[in-house]
Amino acid sequence: MGPGDIRSRNNVTVHGNGHPTLVFAHGFGCDKHMWADVAANFENDYRVVLFDHVGAGQSDLSAYDSGKYGSLDGYARDLVEIGEALELPDAVVIGHSVSSMIGALASIARPDMFTQIVMVGPSPCYIDDEEYTGGFSRQQIDELLTFLEENHLGWSAAMAPQIMGNSERPELSERLNRSFCSTDPDIAREFAKVTFHSDNRNDLPMVKARTLVLQCQQDIIAPQAVGEYVNANIPNSEYRLLEATGHCPNLSAPEEVTEAIRDFLHPSS
């Protein structure tokens, strides 16, 4: 597959000519437009890359393969292929939610390509066990996935307000709900299973990229203890607790997210 095919497959767009390149990766049930309010702030100073995961947005749905995308590794391979198509050196991957782990896996595979990571609301594992708090019991995850399988639109309407938070701004959860509802139901179900059953805890120590963990308050998907765990287990990581609440600060608090990313890219001496 040539560079043009990869760019078409993942609906890749590139803006700006600065250095380094910032690659924005969206989360479950979303597309690249969920980063628009943040990414636009960097186009004058950086090269900004936006893309859709296969199965989302305006990606090539015919490229979706259940075998390849049966784990996050398939999405990480796509991210590396996008980097190769764009000939990226020393890029920064900025991942929301599950794309934090996708970015981590891509950086492990190509540490020369992705030398810095910004993780927004990351979780390496959503399910609690005896020595780890992920935020959900296995039964809760199973019930969540069953609800999604039985009623995609109902799941979207019920979950969007909980995931978004910020109940005083209902337009935010409505935007997220529209995004959920626009995804292909079959692919969404498979991506949800891959996301919520993933366990990347053992991968964290292998991340050599300089990393920023951005943690929101009152995040039901990635609670504060999870962000602290991620930060503690990535060797070269720093942690920042945002004032923003909910799981989608790229929508609810783009200015604060922009400021945090800028501070990370230009640390004070």
How should these model regions be labeled?
Residues 104-109, 113-150:
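Flexible "cap/lid" loop of the alpha/beta hydrolase fold
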Residues 128-136, 146-205:
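Conserved alpha/beta-hydrolase catalytic His-Asp/Glu region
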Residues 10-68:
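Conserved HGGG/HGGXW glycine-rich cap/lid loop of the alpha/beta-hydrolase fold
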Residues 2, 8, 40, 50-98, ...:
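Active-site loop/oxyanion-hole signature of alpha/beta-hydrolase fold enzymes
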Residues 218-222:
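Acidic catalytic loop of the alpha/beta-hydrolase fold
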Residues 207, 213-215:
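Short beta-strand/loop motif that positions the catalytic acidic residue
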Residues 237-269:
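Catalytic active-site module of serine/aspartate enzymes centered on a nucleophile-bearing elbow/loop
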Residues 26-28, 91, 95-97, 216:
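Conserved alpha/beta-hydrolase "nucleophile elbow" surrounding the catalytic nucleophile
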